[in-house]
Amino acid sequence: MTLPAIVLAAVLSAATSVHFPVSTNDPPAQAAIDRGLFLYYAYKGDGAGRSFDEAASHDPGLAMAFWGIALAEGPDLNTPMTAAHFEVAQRAIRHAVLLSGAASERERTFVAIMARRYAGTFADWNADDAAYRDAMTAFAESSHDENAQLLAAEALL
């Protein structure tokens, strides 16, 4: 199956539900992660950010909550990257990196890829975003993770 076909199947599946298992024993934190990603896929970045903030409040050691904050602060088809969003995203992903030792290998991969997007300064962001896009696309192509495939497709837009 080609990447576009895989992405289409993932989009259709995600249209009704999103489950993004993360390393937490807190059901409300997991629910907030799932809701945040669902809202992100619906281009509701503000709502997604609030959901990821909620996940972090339930489980402050959850790297993926801070990864989600960085994701939600990033650009989408309707919202360009700004310096203010960049600063929040960079702070969040740096915190996720610090917490990622307790995360699964899959989660560490998502965190490491997002860290590429915010590795430099806002002035360097276009190059860093290209590095993120390339890494996310490679991960999506090598994994069977629907969320990686959706995020890769979104990064290509």
Please state what every model-predicted region is.
Residues 8-12:
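Hydrophobic helical h-region of N-terminal Sec-dependent signal peptides
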Residues 13-144, 151-157:
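Short coil/linker segments at helix-helix boundaries
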